[in-house]
Amino acid sequence: MTQNDIDYASRVFTERAARILKNHIKKIIMYGSCARGDFDSDSDVDIAIITDMDRKAVKKYDSELMDAVTDIAMNSDAVVEYICLPVDEYNDKKGWYGYYKNIETEGRLLYE
């Protein structure tokens, strides 16, 4: 995977997620090795979607979001792994819980 693949994947996934989830998105953040710049050919593109919906409500969009992931994989060497996090949960945990803290401190904001 190259930086061009990462740029393509993050741009296309962000555009598609914004269309799918519309006004429910608070932030989209790329995190992990691609955000830090220490990715390799086996890395995936980790993306957190911070949303105003609870986990159960956002599940109804999984199929459309997975279609975006599949389209990206078919058109590049990038594999996107995403997670949807409720904004209240994210804000409560980003200061102390390791996973959320890494997203907050190492992440690259893609959409707000």
Regions found by a protein language model. Give the residues of each.
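Catalytic core of pol beta-like nucleotidyltransferases
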Residues: 1-27, 36-41, 52-112
